[in-house]
Amino acid sequence: MRKPAFTPSAVLLALAPLLLIAGCSMAPTYERPDAPVAANWSGPAAQPGRAASNLDWQTFIVDSELRDLVNIALNNNRSLRQTLLDIEQARAQYRIQRSERVPGLSASANGNRQRLPGDLSSNGSSGVSSSYQVGLSLPEYELDLFGRVKSLTDAALEQYLATEDAARSAQIALIAEVSQAYLSYDGAQRRLLLTEQTLASREDSLALIAQRRSAGAATALDYQEALGLVEQSRAELESNARQKQQSLNALVLLLGTPDAASRIPLVPLDKPMLVQDIAPGTPSELIERRPDIRAAEHQLKARNADIGAARAAFFPRISLTGSFGTSSAEMSGLFDGGSRSWNFVPTLSLPIFDAGRNSANLDLAKVRKDSAVAAYEGTIQTAFREVADALAATDTLRREEIARRALANTTEETLKLAKARYEGGVDSHLRYLDAQRSNFINEAAYIETSTQRQIALVDLFRALGGGWDGKPVAQR
C-alpha cells in the first residue's frame, strides 16, 4: 500500500524553516528620548550627606520609632495594598499573553456510538456503529512569522514592569507621608508645650500685676495688657492642641491599623534630627532610579511594541491545529497495530479588505507612542522641578534654622533682662510685655522652621526616588 504523502515527521520538516524565522519583531528599534532638562541641578548645591543612590529609607530615617511606624504602614496601609494587588494582576496578564508563544498540548479521549437508518447507510440497511479515539491534540497555535504575538508579549511585560515601578513609587510616597506626618506631630507637640509654658509664665505675670495694682504700683492698663496676653496664650493653646490632634489623626490613617493611635509614641522634646542629610547625585542617576520615570519609560516601551503588533496585522497569519493518537471501532482495539491516527490542519489567513481597520490601528499605535514620549518627558521635567525645589528648600531652611535659633536665644536673654528691669522699676511694663511676645513668637518660629527643614529633607528623599535598592515591591 502506498504511504501517505504527508506524515507528522514530514510536516515538521516542512515547517522547520517557518519555525526558525517565527518571532521576528516588526516593532521599531527602541531609543530612549533625550531628557529635556539641564545636565546639572539648578539652584544651590546640596549639603554634604549620604548619596541617595546608596541610601535606603531605613538608613535615611535615623529615629528607630519612626522606622517602626513606617514598617507598620507598609504592612497595613490599604492604598498600598491595592497597588500591590495591581502588580499581581499585571503579572498574571503578562503570563497569559506569554503563554501564546508556546504551543499547547492536551490529552483527549472520546467514544461515539450511533445508529444509521437504511436510507443513509452505504449498504442500504440500518445498523449501529461505534468508534473510540485516544490521543494528544494541539490547540490552535499561531506561527509568529511577523512578530505579532511577540510584540503583544513585550507590551504586556513592559506594562507589568510599569505597574511594579508605579507601586514602588506609591511605597516611597507612603514612607514620605508617614515621616512627614510624624514630623508634623512632633512639631505640633513642641509648639503645644511651648504654649503651655508661656501660658503658665503669663499667668504668673498677671498674678504679680494684680498684686502690684492692689498696692498701687501698677495701673489698670498694665493689668489689661497682661490679661490680654494670657487670653492670647489660651487661644494659641487650643490652636496647637487642634493641630497636634489632626497630625495624630493623619498618622493613624496612614498606619492603617485599628490600634494605630496606641502605637504612636510621644516624641521626646530633646530628640535630635529624625532624618539625615542626603546628597542628590547626578541628573542621569535620577532618570535610572526614580520609579515614576522608570514606569513612564516602561509605558513608552509598551507603546513601541504595540506598533510592531499593528504592523504585523497587515501580513498573513498561519495557525496550526492537529492531533495524534489511536482510533478503533472497538475499545479493546485502541492499541492494536494499525490503529494509529493523526490529523493536521494548517490555516492561512490573509487580510484583503478591512475598510481601513489595520491602517487606523497602526495610526493609533503611533499616536499613543507619541503621547507616551510626551508623558515620559513631562515626568522627567516634573521630577527635576521637585528635586530643584527640595534642594532650594533644604538649603534655605538650614540657614533659616540657624538664624532663628540665634534670634530665639537673643530674645530669651532680652526677656530675662526686661523682666529684671521691670521688677527693679527701671523699665515700663509695656516693654516687658513686648519682650514676652517677641520671645514666644521667635521660639515658635524656630520650632516651625526646624520641623519644616526635616520635612523638606523628606521631600528631597522622595524627589530623588527614595534610595531605591532595586528589590521587587511585591512577592514574585
What do the PLM-derived regions correspond to, one by one?
Residues G216-T219, A383, A390, G425-H429:
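Alpha-helical heptad-repeat coiled-coil segments that mediate oligomerization/polymerization in large
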Residues R81-Q82, R98, L143-Q171, Q197, ...:
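Sec/SRP-type N-terminal targeting helices
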Residues R2-N75, T153, L157, A241-E288, ...:
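Terminal intrinsically disordered/low-complexity segments used for targeting and assembly
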Residues V70, Q133-G135, Y182, L227, ...:
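Membrane-embedded beta-strand positions in outer-membrane beta-barrel channels/transporters
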Residues A45-P48, A52-I61, N110-L138, A261-A279, ...:
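Small/polar, glycine/serine/threonine/aspartate-rich low-complexity segments that form flexible
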Residues V149, D165-T282, A393, L417, ...:
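Periplasmic alpha-helical coiled-coil/stalk elements that build and connect Gram-negative outer-membrane
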Residues R213-A217, Y422-V426, A463-G467:
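A short glycine-centered flexible hinge/capping loop motif at secondary-structure junctions
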Residues S25, L66-D68, S131-Q133, Q180, ...:
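Transmembrane beta-barrel architecture of outer-membrane proteins
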